[in-house]
Design a protein with these regions (language model features):
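Function-dense linear segments that define catalytic or interfacial modules
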Residues: 82-95, 104-122, 129, 136, ...
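Terminal-appendage/accessory-domain detector
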Residues: 1-102, 195-212, 219-447
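Hydrophobic alpha-helix position signal
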Residues: 58, 116, 169-170, 412
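Buried hydrophobic packing segments
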Residues: 39, 108-115, 130-137, 162-170, ...
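Glycine-rich, mobile lid/loop segments that gate access to catalytic sites or pores
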Residues: 117-120, 124-216, 230, 235
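Short connector loops/turns at beta-strand edges and beta->alpha or beta->beta junctions
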Residues: 88, 107-109, 114, 136, ...
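Conserved, well-structured ligand/cofactor-binding cores
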Residues: 73-76, 97-105, 109, 118-131, ...
Length: 447
């Protein structure tokens, strides 16, 4: 029987062979959908308190480069990656890879764009580097490993985001195989991010810090810095340390069965993905119920929903994004659960608060976070129920380009106005030479 290639060696080989890979139009289209989504959620968060704070700190560091903060000046690539990576996750509205790695595009595109600007790389090179970084993160988080980390209290997006960022940077910096191995080692020894931070500014910071740490790892490797090269395989490495009972390990041969990018998911709602099935179900029921006549609400949800999105009494808009009761209450009240619905005004709406108080979570063992139901018990004794076997935005029930354009417009028009449509069209044709400079010129004016 053929002996499995060590995971670390397979990852290094996958990164090193990036220039030789030719991607199909389908794959490039998927990468560009990630890019459009990334710009939409990042630009929409330009005034978010977390984004503003991180930008102020990064700007205070002083040294400049050629990489731009969104709506800001040219700074070092590390500073741009930190600021832009944080912005991309401030609204918790960014794409999600449900195999276990979480929000991959946030740190990955932040690094790809920063280094492409800094080093004059082409749009095609940036796309190729992003795809490689995305695959590294998605494959390391697959096989139940990422989900196990989440149950253990770790934020997979933060952990695997460092590897996607390091891989993307390694490609754009032209690292050799030895340097790539060291870069992955440095990225691995910096992993972190706790689920206990969900509902606070620290959660989006996880992704900005992952972007910066991954880029730093590659920069250090290029400068001759050496690190452990066995962290993806050794018992005292990534899986053995973070899952100490050995119940789940990194999947062997993780780069041999097509591209995980084609299984990415996108959010129609500006809240934790684990709430979306219940939002879908609630919106189905909204036209059939009068909120004031609801006596009791049962939310059928996955164990993961209970683990990460079950805040029973949210007090801030950020907490609301991780409260399936609040998100379902929005849906039942006829709201679309877009970013504007996660506001202090909406959160304090007495009718919405009344629905939250009437809600209870019924965990459905063995179900995925993409499925759920809402059951409404009315004061007249009637019961209404809507089941959602697969929430909108996931593979099998995907978001269309039309849906993505509507999401993008809703986020960007308040910021860019008439420039929104030209920006969208430019991103859709991102592989065209000269597009990167054109795009960044549109989104780097100061506000």
């Amino acid at each position: 029987m053929k002996q499995a290639t060590p995971i670390g060696d397979a990852a290094v080989n996958f990164i090193a062979t990036t220039p030789a890979r030719k991607h199909t139009p389908e794959v490039l289209d998927a990468a560009k959908m990630c890019l459009v989504d990334w710009f939409g959620v990042a630009l929409g968060a330009v005034n978010a308190p977390a984004a503003q704070a991180v930008r102020r700190v990064a700007l205070s560091w002083g040294p400049t480069g050629k990489a731009h903060m969104l709506f800001g000046p040219a700074v070092t690539p590390a500073a741009a990656a930190l600021a832009n990576g944080t912005m991309a996750h401030c609204m918790d509205y960014d794409d999600t890879h449900l195999d276990g790695a979480g929000h991959i595009s946030g740190p990955t595109w932040a690094v790809a764009l920063a280094l492409a600007e800094e080093h004059g790389k082409t749009e095609q090179e940036a796309l190729a580097a992003f795809i490689t970084g995305f695959e590294i993160s998605a494959r390391l988080g697959a096989g139940g490993f990422g989900r196990k980390l989440q149950y253990n209290g770790f934020h997979p997006s933060s952990i695997f985001g460092r590897f996607s960022a390091a891989a993307t940077a390694a490609v754009l910096l032209g690292l050799d195989r030895t340097q790539i191995a060291y870069a992955l080692g440095v990225a691995g020894t910096t992993v972190g991010g706790l689920n206990g931070s969900f509902g606070t500014m620290s959660k989006p910071f996880h992704l900005g810090k992952a972007a910066m740490d991954g880029l730093l790892a590659a920069d250090l490797a290029r400068a001759g810095f050496e690190s452990a090269t066995h962290l993806l395989d050794a018992e005292n490495g990534l899986s053995g340390t973070l899952v100490q009972d050995g119940s789940v390990k990194l999947a062997p041969e993780p780069f041999t069965d097509g591209l995980a990018l084609l299984r990415n998911a996108y959010k129609p709602y500006a809240c934790c993905k684990a709430t979306h099935a219940c939002v879908d179900a609630a919106r189905k029921l909204s036209a059939r119920v009068t909120p004031g006549l609801i006596q009791r609400i049962v939310l059928g949800a996955s164990p993961m929903t209970l683990a990460v999105a079950a805040k029973p009494n949210p007090q801030t808009p950020l907490e609301g994004k991780f409260s399936v009761a609040y998100c379902a209450a929005l849906g039942l009240s006829g709201y679309a659960a877009v970013e504007g619905d996660f506001s202090d005004t909406r959160l304090r709406d007495p009718d919405v608060r009344a629905l939250i108080a009437k809600s209870e979570i019924a965990v459905q063992p063995g179900t995925e976070l993409t499925e759920g139901f809402v059951e409404v018990h009315l004061t007249d004794g009637k019961t209404l129920r809507a089941d959602v076997p697969l929430a909108l935005g996931n593979p099998g029930n995907p978001m269309s380009w039309t849906g993505m354009e509507a999401k993008f417009a809703g986020l960007v028009e308040p910021v860019l106005g008439d420039e929104t449509r030209p920006l969208f069209e430019a991103l859709r044709r991102f592989e065209t030479p000269g597009t990167l400079a054109k795009v960044m010129a549109m989104v780097t004016r100061t506000t």
